[in-house]
C-alpha cells in the first residue's frame, strides 16, 4: 500500500547550500520533517550545481517521511545569465536591459524541456521567449520556424 500524502512544500534553494536556517528550516519544521536529513540529501544530490538556484518540490507523508524532486533552474535566471544582466527591467515594455538570440533561447528551452508542459521544442522556445520579453530583454533575429 502506498504512503498517504499530507502535503507538499515548494522551495527555491541554491544547489549544495541547503541549511536549517530560513527559509528551509521553518518550512520543513512546520510539517514535522527532519530538517537535517533533508539538507544532507539535497546537498548530496545537488553538489554538481553549486550556487545555482534550484526549485525543489518536497512531498510530505503521514509518517513524517518525505521525497523530493529537484527541478531545472528558473528560465528567468538562465536568461539573465545568457544576457549577462543582474536582473530584469522594472518596466519591460519601455526600458530594455539586454538582448538574447534564438540560439540562446533554444539552449535554455532544451534545458527546461523536462519541466515545461510542451511537447515540441518550438513551443518551449516560445515560452522562454515570452519570459525574456517580460524581463525587458529583446529577442534578436528571426524565429527559426518563420522561414
Swiss-Prot record:
GO terms for biological process: translation. SUPFAM superfamilies: Ribosomal L11/L12e N-terminal domain, Ribosomal protein L11, C-terminal domain. SMART domains: RL11. GO terms for cellular component: cytosolic large ribosomal subunit. One or more lysine residues are methylated. InterPro entries: Ribosomal_uL11 (IPR000911), Ribosomal_uL11_bac-typ (IPR006519), Ribosomal_uL11_C (IPR020783), Ribosomal_uL11_C_sf (IPR036769), Ribosomal_uL11_CS (IPR020785), Ribosomal_uL11_N (IPR020784), Ribosomal_uL11_N_sf (IPR036796). It holds the Pfam family Ribosomal_L11_N. One of its GO terms (molecular function) is large ribosomal subunit rRNA binding. Keywords: Methylation, Ribonucleoprotein, Ribosomal protein, RNA-binding, rRNA-binding. NCBIfam families: L11_bact. Forms part of the ribosomal stalk which helps the ribosome interact with GTP-bound translation factors. HAMAP family: Ribosomal_uL11. Belongs to the universal ribosomal protein uL11 family. Part of the ribosomal stalk of the 50S ribosomal subunit. Interacts with L10 and the large rRNA to form the base of the stalk. L10 forms an elongated spine to which L12 dimers bind in a sequential fashion forming a multimeric L10(L12)X complex. This is Large ribosomal subunit protein uL11. It comes from Cytophaga hutchinsonii (strain ATCC 33406 / DSM 1761 / CIP 103989 / NBRC 15051 / NCIMB 9469 / D465). The gene is rplK.
Amino acid at each position: 500500500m502506498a504512503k498517504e500524502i499530507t502535503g507538499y512544500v515548494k522551495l527555491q534553494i541554491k544547489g549544495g547550500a541547503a541549511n536549517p536556517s530560513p527559509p528551509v528550516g521553518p518550512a520543513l519544521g512546520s510539517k514535522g520533517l527532519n530538517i537535517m536529513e533533508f539538507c544532507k540529501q539535497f546537498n548530496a544530490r545537488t553538489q554538481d550545481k553549486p550556487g545555482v538556484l534550484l526549485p525543489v518540490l518536497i512531498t510530505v507523508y503521514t509518517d513524517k517521511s518525505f521525497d523530493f524532486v529537484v527541478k531545472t533552474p528558473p528560465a528567468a535566471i538562465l536568461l539573465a545569465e545568457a544576457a549577462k544582466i543582474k536582473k530584469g527591467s522594472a518596466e519591460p515594455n519601455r526600458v530594455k536591459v539586454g538582448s538574447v538570440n534564438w540560439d540562446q533561447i533554444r539552449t535554455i528551452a532544451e534545458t527546461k524541456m523536462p519541466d515545461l508542459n510542451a511537447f515540441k521544442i518550438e513551443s518551449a522556445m516560445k515560452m522562454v521567449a515570452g519570459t525574456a520579453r517580460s524581463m525587458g530583454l529583446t529577442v534578436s533575429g528571426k524565429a527559426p520556424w518563420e522561414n
